[in-house]
Amino acid sequence: MTIKSDKWIRRMAMEHGMIEPFEPNQVKHAPDGHKIVSYGTSSYGYDIRCSDEFKLFTNINSAIVDPKNFDSNSFVDVKSNICLIPPNSFALARTVEYFRIPRNVLTICLGKSTYARCGIIVNVTPFEPEWEGFVTLEFSNTTPLPAKIYANEGVAQVIFFESDEICETSYKDRGGKYQGQHGVTLPKI
């Protein structure tokens, strides 16, 4: 497996629709000129943005978090340019970008240091071969203070690995439960 460069990412996005919408360069300023958390193509990855759709965790309605029997009432829907995550809590969001992963590619997603250095951890599972959809993002606030997430700015970096061999069974072939997801998607069994 080899890690893919900015040149490959641009080609796959522009010729094959791998990332939509796609930013071929690194964006560090908003249209009005103020600094933002960067997003777009980097040397060996793509910095993804968070949309303005959040699901903020609340423990008002639930006593237990059970991934096999998840209660959707455990979240409050928030549509905003910022999301304030309470201390020691978390939120879900989705990317601005829609991904279509080639059959011979696997991605790993890592949080941006801007957020990590503030105690905000971004967790995203790998994008498997032939998976497509908006990415559900998990934000954990590890601090004893409220933490702010900015919509339409960079939150994590996707690194693309191309295999030297095509997999026998892709995520699409398996009928993966998160295939083609739109919006913020809660756990499924």
From Swiss-Prot:
Q: Which keywords appear in this protein's UniProt record, sorted alphabetically?
A: Hydrolase, Nucleotide metabolism, Nucleotide-binding
Q: In which pathway does it act?
A: Pyrimidine metabolism; dUMP biosynthesis; dUMP from dCTP (dUTP route): step 1/2
Q: Please list the GO terms describing molecular function.
A: dCTP deaminase activity; nucleotide binding
What is the catalytic activity of this protein? dCTP + H2O + H(+) = dUTP + NH4(+)
> What EC number(s) is this enzyme filed under?
3.5.4.13
Residues forming the catalytic site: 138
RNA-binding recorded as keyword: no
Q: Name one GO biological process term.
A: dUMP biosynthetic process
Show the Pfam families listed in the entry. Answer: DCD
Note the InterPro entries from the entry: dCTP_deaminase, dUTPase-like_sf, dUTPase_trimeric
Q: Which SUPFAM superfamilies match?
A: dUTPase-like
* Binding residue positions for dCTP: 112-117, 136-138, 157, 171, 181
The record's listing under PANTHER family reads:
DCTP DEAMINASE
Give the protein's biological function.
Catalyzes the deamination of dCTP to dUTP.
**Can you state the subunit structure given in the record?**
Homotrimer.
Entry's HAMAP family? Answer: dCTP_deaminase
Q: Which family does it belong to?
A: Belongs to the dCTP deaminase family.
Which protein is depicted? dCTP deaminase
This chain is encoded by the gene named dcd
